[in-house]
Amino acid sequence: MEQLKEGNSYFVDEQYDEALKCYDKACLELSNNAEAFFKRSQCHSKLSNLKEALSDINTSIKLDSNNSKYYLKKGQLCFELEEFDTALKTFEKGQSIDSENSSFKTWIRKSKAEIQSNPTTTTTTTPTPTPTPTPAPQPVTTTTNPTPIPTTSNTTTTTNNNNNNNNNNNNNNNNNNTTTDSTTTKLPIPSSGNKVRHEWYQTETHVVLTIFAKFVTASNSKINLTSKSVNISFPLANGSEFLFEMDLFDPIVDKDSTIHYYSTKVEIKMKKSRAIKWDTLEFTDKSGPVGLMDQISSSPAVPSPYASKKDWDKLPNEPEEKLEGDQALNKIFRDIFSKGSEDQQRAMMKSFTESGGTVLSTNWDEVGSKKVVGEPPKGLEFKQYEK
């Protein structure tokens, strides 16, 4: 389990090679853990190892056939491998398990569109060599009578019609391509580099997730929030698709959560269902939260660089330290001296010094005009110090 947690940390930091090493060890130790193979499948997908990713997600489905997110991941991998029929069946299976997840509806629509478009593309590519001049002259060369001439004209007209139809189809395809090109010019792009970066932080009442990508809008993106998960998808300018799917650490109030679109980022503000501290953004195998919100106030999510290990909130409850001997006596002197007037402070200094520390008076009228004589405690004799 430690290897799985360590791999998750590397994965969040986008250190996929290191994460894969940890996931390999986790899959060996936890051979019956479907989540371990799912994590490794995600890591393989990030490293473009699509076949390895598909193998791992199939293992996850064998170990846990009722988890809808495994079917969603498998369908996406099949779609990327252009296995659209398998992808469609997988998405439909996942939708039957979790009908509330709108991501399945989106991917089913995409898969059907690809399946419908593939036959047209294959028929337009294969018939192109058939309308060549070779079949048309055959009736002319085989027949010597002039009567077949109308038939040749018919054949030429049909071939011309076919050519016209093909040209129309090509024109339609070109028109479609131009429309898609016009839309892809404004597709989102990462704010920096080729990877879409994300960050998150929490307050007492909300968890804020930020996706750093430019030109993301409500029309070109799909963001689905449920009480237990967040699903984000939008196409990128390089032709790929950004996907962010995560089961949340603790349930949220999706109705009270908000999504804000900016020119360089998307901010998703999710309201917590209860005032607890989230250890991570993603759900873990640990049952129950770390603690109530009083723990968040005592240990902030972003600690100060000058933070002390002392728990200052508990200071009022700590018993005061009891002083003894000279420390207690000096404390009394300091308290009296700090609160006294200027004459009282002068009287204390004069009486204490002249009496050798045996007399302490705050009455300047009494000690100011005469020398203070030392008064030793009972049973002791006062003697002058001889140098």
UniProtKB/Swiss-Prot annotation:
GO terms for molecular function: protein-folding chaperone binding. Residues 308-323 have a biased composition (Basic and acidic residues). Residues 110-193, 299-323 are annotated as: Disordered. Residues 118-127, 139-185 have a biased composition (Low complexity). InterPro entries: CS_dom, HSP20-like_chaperone, SGS_dom, Sgt1-like, TPR-like_helical_dom_sf, TPR_rpt. It comes from the Eukaryota. The keyword Repeat applies. PROSITE patterns: CS, SGS, TPR, TPR_REGION. TPR repeats lie at residues 1-34, 36-67, 68-101. Residues 301-387 form the SGS domain. SUPFAM superfamilies: HSP20-like chaperones (SSF49764), TPR-like (SSF48452). Residues 193-282 form the CS domain. The keyword Repeat applies. Residues 128-138 have a biased composition (Pro residues). Keywords: Repeat, TPR repeat, Ubl conjugation pathway. One of its GO terms (cellular component) is ubiquitin ligase complex. May play a role in ubiquitination and subsequent proteasomal degradation of target proteins. Belongs to the SGT1 family. This is Protein SGT1 homolog. It comes from Dictyostelium discoideum.
